[in-house]
Amino acid sequence: MERMDIIIWLLAVVIVLTTLMIFLHLKTLKIIRLLFPISKELSKKSCVFPWKKKWTKNYPPSSMYP
């Protein structure tokens, strides 16, 4: 029974962390950088959160498309 309690507790922690990352991803990014230095290197390359990257810089203006 103790193993089931640990699994349920871990699932709850994962759910809480994912919701925090969705709604408060800027604040959790700072916390993650403090906890995991490896993710700091990844976030510099914008691999962790690709939606923060402005894709419009690499593409021509929308007026060129039909």
Curated annotation (Swiss-Prot):
Residues annotated as transmembrane: 8-24
Modified residues (N6-acetyllysine): 54, 57
Main location class: mitochondrion
Family of this protein: Belongs to the ATPase protein 8 family.
Cellular component per GO, a single term: mitochondrial membrane
Protein name as catalogued: ATP synthase F(0) complex subunit 8
Organism: Loxodonta africana
Alphabetical keyword list: Acetylation, ATP synthesis, CF(0), Hydrogen ion transport, Ion transport, Membrane, Mitochondrion, Transmembrane, Transmembrane helix, Transport
Subcellular localization, as worded in the UniProt entry: Mitochondrion membrane
Gene: MT-ATP8
Summary of subunit composition and partner proteins: Component of the ATP synthase complex composed at least of ATP5F1A/subunit alpha, ATP5F1B/subunit beta, ATP5MC1/subunit c (homooctomer), MT-ATP6/subunit a, MT-ATP8/subunit 8, ATP5ME/subunit e, ATP5MF/subunit f, ATP5MG/subunit g, ATP5MK/subunit k, ATP5MJ/subunit j, ATP5F1C/subunit gamma, ATP5F1D/subunit delta, ATP5F1E/subunit epsilon, ATP5PF/subunit F6, ATP5PB/subunit b, ATP5PD/subunit d, ATP5PO/subunit OSCP.
Domain of life: Eukaryota
Role of this protein: Subunit 8, of the mitochondrial membrane ATP synthase complex (F(1)F(0) ATP synthase or Complex V) that produces ATP from ADP in the presence of a proton gradient across the membrane which is generated by electron transport complexes of the respiratory chain. ATP synthase complex consist of a soluble F(1) head domain - the catalytic core - and a membrane F(1) domain - the membrane proton channel. These two domains are linked by a central stalk rotating inside the F(1) region and a stationary peripheral stalk.
N6-succinyllysine PTM positions: 54
A biological process term (GO) from this entry: ATP biosynthetic process
Membrane topology: Single-pass membrane protein
